[in-house]
Amino acid sequence: MNVKYNSEKPKKSKKIKLFNLSNEQLTRHKSLNKMNNSEKENINSINIQNNTQNEKNKLKQSDLDFAFYKDLTSKSYADDFSGSCGYTFTIFRSINEIFYLIFASIEKSIMSYDIKNNQKICEIKNAHNNYIIDFRHFYDKKNKRDLLISVSSFDNNIKLWNIYNWTCILEIKNANRTGALYSASFLCENNEIYIISSNSNLLKRKDPIKIFNLNGAIIKQIKFSNSIDFIDCYYEINNIYIILGTHNNVISYDYTNNKMYNNYGKYGQTKGHYTGIIVHNSKLIASNFGGIIEICDFHTGEVLNEINMSICSGFLGVCLWDENNLLVGCTDRTIKLINLKEKKLKKCFYGHKYFVATVKKIYIPKIGDCFISQGMTSDTIKLWTVKK
């Protein structure tokens, strides 16, 4: 395996001092008591102006919009399986303050890119024997390190990487014996980290979901009759839930108590399989290939909200921007901004050549909040910023 590094070292980011607001409020309160009436009236008028400005800011926030910033790379590749299975790239801020973008090339290499300093870090050539369709990052708090796993579809292997020197720490061969592995994720229990892999019933063998320790040994298997395209974990209070995306529905499994937890979604069989899944604040948001978004109560399974845009396009990757706004990668080569509260399509963003597989949000110093999108096949990875 050849690892090719960029010789330039990324610049260190400047530390930002945080202002102690509570001390300022205390000082201001004491000074107000010493003011005469006219001075207090002036302060009150300033407060009214500030409140008016705050209302304007809220109004601006409701008119959320984005602008194309730049193409990060034109060398990325996302296999057709990727958009409905996992994350075709990952972005994260590492412990050593590098803003990583990790993606795959058509040559089955893993590419590492520093977003903040706009430079390539390294390339791992021939990282897998087949197209890489899923990346996951995890911060190991116990050992204070960043971990990365990559999943390839038909070489059936999972690899765990050290991102600081780009060596393969662990290779799990034949993680799924049916010949296709679509998705894998990290599972953390009592500060111990495990790798959990999806199954696939292409050959109708009904392989179980497998959980491996970081030595590659299987510690647990969970049997499912469904073929799993997407897998992830959701943590709430003292419970760990495994989130499973299938062609027909979304399933949650209570890992802590070893039992099935819930079923979500009612359109999988008639409107296309589920392609994007997020769990946030006890709500599960799922999009499907038929252009429908369902928002469900995670614990009861009840559908709280439904947005049908099947006349526009099919949906792939989803990204929750804030409590009210969702970004969705679509089959019509756009990213759509949807207001969940109003159930309305607010904006469409153009520029990709093919289906948009994955959309993710990140904060980058000097740029601010932004999102990154990737199209399937040999498309670009694009960076978008908030319009001010």
List the predicted regions and their residue ranges.
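Intrinsically disordered, low-complexity acidic/Ser/Thr/Pro-rich linker and tail segments
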Residues: 2-111, 199-200
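Per-blade loop-tip surfaces of WD-repeat and WD-like beta-propellers in eukaryotic adaptors/scaffolds
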Residues: 64-73, 112-122, 160-179, 204-220, ...
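WD40/WD-repeat beta-propeller blade N-cap
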Residues: 77-87, 125-132, 173-181, 223-228, ...
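Loop/turn segments within WD40 beta-propeller blades
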Residues: 91-98, 136-145, 185-192, 232-239, ...
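Conserved beta-strand element within WD40/beta-propeller blades
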Residues: 101-105, 148-153, 195-203, 242-245, ...
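Short coil/turn segments within WD40 beta-propeller repeats
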Residues: 107-111, 154-158, 201-209, 248-251, ...
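Solenoidal tandem-repeat scaffolds enriched in leucines and small polar residues
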Residues: 179-187, 193-261
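Blade-level signature of beta-propeller repeat domains, shared across WD40, Kelch, NHL, RCC1
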Residues: 356-388
